[in-house]
C-alpha cells in the first residue's frame, strides 16, 4: 500500500486529468488506470477561472482523492496562493507544489520550491513537491517536512523516460518518505523501470492522454506499475560478466 501523509492508497499510479481528446476518453482512461489519486491544475478549475472548462466535470470525484497542483506558478508566493485557493474549495489539504523556473524546459525552481513547501507545511498542507533528480534538494525537502518527493524522470511531457536512473536510485535509497517519479514518462517500460528501481509510485498524464489509445495505455500503465513493483519486491538476479548455465550438466556424457 502507498501511504502519503497518513492516508493509504491501493494503487501506486497517480493520474493527471488534462490533455485528453474528450471527456468520455478521460473518464474511461481514469477507470482503466485503477488510480486512487487524480491530479489537476488549480488554474484550470472553472470555479476559479470563469469561462474555462472544468477538467473534473465528467468524473465521479467521490471515488478518488484529489491532488491539486500549482502548475503555472513562477514564485513561491504564486504557488502558495494557488494551494490556498484549492483548499478553500473544500477539496483537500494535499497539494503538489510545482514552481517552474524555465519556460522552455519546465524544470522546477529549487529555491522557490523550497520556500513554497516550507510555507505550506506551516499552513497544515500535505505537501508533495515536484523537483529535479538532485539528491541534496530532495533531502532538504524531506527535512522541511514534505510528505512525499516527486523527482522528474525527464522534462515534463517530453516522453524521454528515465534519463538518470542513478540519480533517482540515490533519492529512493536515502529518503524515508515516498518517492513518486513524476514527469517525462513515455511508455509502460519507463513505468516498470521506475518501479523496479524502488520508486513508491509514478505520476502520469501526457503518456496516457497523448497516446494513440488513452484507455488501452492507461491499462498498460496500471499493469506496468504492478509488474515493476512485484519485480522490485522479488529482487532481480545479480548481473554477471559471463554466462551461467541454467541447465544441470550432471549426467551428460562427453566424447
From Swiss-Prot:
Pathway: Cofactor biosynthesis; thiamine diphosphate biosynthesis. GO terms for molecular function: thiazole synthase activity. The active site is at 96 (schiff-base intermediate with dxp). It holds the Pfam family ThiG. The keyword Nucleotide-binding does not apply. Its EC number is 2.8.1.10. It catalyses: [ThiS sulfur-carrier protein]-C-terminal-Gly-aminoethanethioate + 2-iminoacetate + 1-deoxy-D-xylulose 5-phosphate = [ThiS sulfur-carrier protein]-C-terminal Gly-Gly + 2-[(2R,5Z)-2-carboxy-4-methylthiazol-5(2H)-ylidene]ethyl phosphate + 2 H2O + H(+). The keyword Cytoplasm applies. It is found in: Cytoplasm. SUPFAM superfamilies: ThiG-like. Keywords: Cytoplasm, Schiff base, Thiamine biosynthesis, Transferase. Its main location: cytoplasm. One of its GO terms (biological process) is thiamine diphosphate biosynthetic process. InterPro entries: Aldolase_TIM, Thiazole_synthase_ThiG, ThiG. 1-deoxy-D-xylulose 5-phosphate binds at residues 157, 183-184, 205-206. GO terms for cellular component: cytoplasm. Homotetramer. Forms heterodimers with either ThiH or ThiS. Belongs to the ThiG family. HAMAP family: ThiG. Catalyzes the rearrangement of 1-deoxy-D-xylulose 5-phosphate (DXP) to produce the thiazole phosphate moiety of thiamine. Sulfur is provided by the thiocarboxylate moiety of the carrier protein ThiS. In vitro, sulfur can be provided by H(2)S. This is Thiazole synthase. It comes from Exiguobacterium sibiricum (strain DSM 17290 / CCUG 55495 / CIP 109462 / JCM 13490 / 255-15).
